[in-house]
Amino acid sequence: HYRNVDRHDVMTDPHILSMRIDESLYFANAAYLEDTVFAQAALREDLAHVILMCPAVNAIDLSALEALEEINTRLRENDIALHLSEVKGPVMDALERSDFLNHLSGEIFLSHHHAVMALRTRETADPALI
């Protein structure tokens, strides 16, 4: 299980930032999402991956899609990949109708655990073996 690092004594990975989104994404919270992702990313010198965990996101509007595009672009400019996990069907449908997935620097994972395990494996892999 993945827990709030401010409330629980948990292990973290310096290369991975996991953020859980607890509501639908729309114009009223899109800028807050951007600001929060960038603020947290700035605190991690060795960051390579940001995973937005989306099990509570039931809907997404155009403003939020634009925010995700901006997050993806700015992270990519800093060699950080953006990934999504646990995306619900209707939200995935909206992402597929947009151009966002064509530019996503990372991947979409069915489960958050799978995302973390896959990305940790990549970060710890011996470059000589790849």
Where do the protein language model's features map onto the residues?
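Structured cytosolic domains appended to multi-pass membrane proteins
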Residues: 2-130
